[in-house]
């Protein structure tokens, strides 16, 4: 009897699973054939390819479609290919797609759970409004002297070590961004150029890497989304949470006891704890931690890809050095904030590195209010409803390498950004996202990467070391776009 019940349950389960696989067919939306149980993401489940690589592959296969229907396990998901539709989702119809497909309970992960990236609805809106004043261009000018100091320390650090060894680019850039975030967010010297493994680096090495059991939970939640509400999942390791909380607590106390005012993000948070009774110490800690994790990691990823591309493309490196040298030479061997803003070729090279290697390879939005998809006249699809709760994917990696928008899409050619008319890459080049949910730290991230690279190019000739495995393949597991094997660079002092 039990056997019969189990058989009936399994057969009905299989039947229902297969039934769901007709979801897109019924609506006439094109898409790749799903594999039973895993849907279209088998290569990610088997740790062969990153999700961003997979979405981009699917994006590329369906050249003539505005959207592609796929299955994550047996859940229907939409990949949006059309820039006009992307504009609608991120800007015009934002009220239908205002949340990210990410879930962290702030009672379980109090630091990242309070981060705007993970927050939803009204809570996201009010937190974003609270933090936005910390990222104005005025505030960037405020922290710029700290960034200059850290950049000079970077040059001294490379200088000291380059005789004996070449550098793992990501690690070098991470030391730089950790020091700059330490200075600009916490008002502290993170000592990443002095010690081999200082506390900030230990925290940085572990922050975004869910360990053991948490990684298994993350995988299960991805496969079976209903588990989100049943399984307690955290990204921030417990000991990292304790260390960061202590750093913030001590800094706030020290400032209070000694009446210290510094030009940094912590001062803004400190003021909020004094002026807003709803803003508690745990909020200050969470937002300082948010600045920490978003500030060092994405920027160090971008910076190391930019250095790699400059090392691999000598012509671009030389041209960039001419621009940078001129600015330093005309300003007493310094690079003032206003001068950095004028470096158009540096800006183009930065954008081109972001185009080729966007750290966030895909954006996953959730439909928060049913949305009617209206096809164009030449489409073979009827109008249909994108239901509340459906996940829509914007494949940044797919868009950024689409030959329809970028000629020779796999080549590093900063000139394309110089020649382009304003806004011509809108909604096809969007490394920071678009619309109300776009990256809050874009100004700070761009500033620290550009100043760090400017100081390096001013002082060193860089080349790719033979230890680098080419062509670069992306890590299938890490949540950001990162090479599976490290990029090694050689530095030759020229000044
Ligand atoms: C160059 C480096 C960076 C890149 C490429 C980058 C990219 C992104 C992307 C793609 C998003 C998602 C946008 C969306 O959902 O539409 C995002 C969100 C966010 N980023 Fe960045 N980011 C960078 C640096 C930073 C820095 C330095 C900070 C802060 C110090 C920061 C803070 C945030 C926050 C708070 C969000 C969530 C915004 C929201 O949901 O309202 N980012 N970033």
Predicted features and spans:
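Cytochrome P450 heme-binding "Cys pocket" and the immediately downstream C-terminal segment
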Residues: 314-316, 425, 442-480
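Cytochrome P450 heme-thiolate "Cys pocket" and heme-binding signature region
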Residues: 133, 289, 382, 419-449, ...
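Conserved cytochrome P450 K-helix/beta-meander segment immediately N-terminal to the heme-binding cysteine loop
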Residues: 394-421
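Cytochrome P450 catalytic-domain helical core, especially the substrate-recognition surface
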Residues: 32-57, 76, 103-186, 198-253, ...
